[in-house]
Amino acid sequence: MTPDELRARTKKFAVDVIRFAKEDVPGDPINDEIARQLTDAATSVAAGYRAVCRARSRADFIYKLGNAIEEADESALWLEILCESGICPGHQTSP
């Protein structure tokens, strides 16, 4: 996968998560907070990968890529929580 393809995929992931949070997560204070955490993490994946593409050194590249990977893992956690807590049916949070 090329850097441009990964850039497009991370952006699509962020947009898909925003739509999911708006349309499929039932609104109440707890769910809203979980949806906010998920949206923050997912959009940070896309923003973080763009930062990776602008890295000025190998060390900077590795550091920024690590941050983007952490945000991706956090996104997965929030999706798992939504699924396993019964807030959203499992079919909505599976790939």
Predicted regions and their residues:
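Amphipathic alpha-helical assembly/interaction segments
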Residues: 1-95
